[in-house]
Amino acid sequence: MQVSDVEIRPYPYPYRAMLAICSDLDRTPDRFCYERIMRFCNTTAPTPMGDGVALEVGNSIYFSMPPDQFAYWNTDSTGRAMVRALIRSGHIDTLHSFGDWARTRTEAGAALDELSRHDCMLAVWVDHATAPTNF
């Protein structure tokens, strides 16, 4: 074999393609539903939607939303602990804006302070809406 016969594969052997999937929490009503979605996507455990599909699927989180939508500030301490654990494990990897009810830089700062206080980091920001905190 000559050096010219060697090439870098675009994907690690034996794979020929890649796919990234991220769930989006829009309209998720509460921590129970959020957890069921994550369990269905990431495990083989039985869920109300059927047996889990065992994919590695990330998700997003808001901080401040109306009471009928799951967000960090409007869930209970168990829900907030779940969010922090999912951030640390990499299953929540996206800040889906600070939320529709976060209206000031002070509120955005409080969310960032909360992440920092719990040693949680989200490197991805996404917002396909018109959140007031799109400064």
Regions found by a protein language model. Give the residues of each.
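Catalytic alpha-helical scaffold of carbohydrate-active enzymes acting on polysaccharides/glycoconjugates
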Residues: M1-F135
